[in-house]
């Protein structure tokens, strides 16, 4: 459910991407909300109180939307390469695959400042690609529970155990700047632990 390619981005390109983001940092939209693992913020009172869909956690992060990127953006260039599309298709064993058409989120930068956190959740898409640009001073560890649910089996009991702190299924992935992560998040519960320090 999770694969990492270390040093996928060359140091020169990594530096350009970091500079690109810093130059537009004032355009980053930061938001806070409480969500359940299914990315919903509304409570369903028809369910039992301890149902996973009724367990909410704080989320705090921000995005530099894709439509704000300059035409010569290094990240935009990478995203639009046919070679990358073919490579990812081969990695996940799905063909054909398509780029996300959303002009705001297709290759957005995800920013987490001090106290930033992404709580336990499932993704709405089958898989995602992430590139680590910069590590925080402390925290920001990617944790995941591989294939804890599947098609036709939500496995609510096991999901609930993780939400209440059980660590038996939890794995950690320590990413370094320049690493590419290919992650199947639709069926794998995952989170990013709280960021500490002044480095976003």
Per-region residue spans from a language model:
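Short strand-connecting beta-turns/loops that link adjacent beta-strands
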Residues: 10, 125, 138, 197-198
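Soluble, non-transmembrane catalytic domains of enzymes that act on hydrophobic metabolites at membranes
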Residues: 25, 189-192
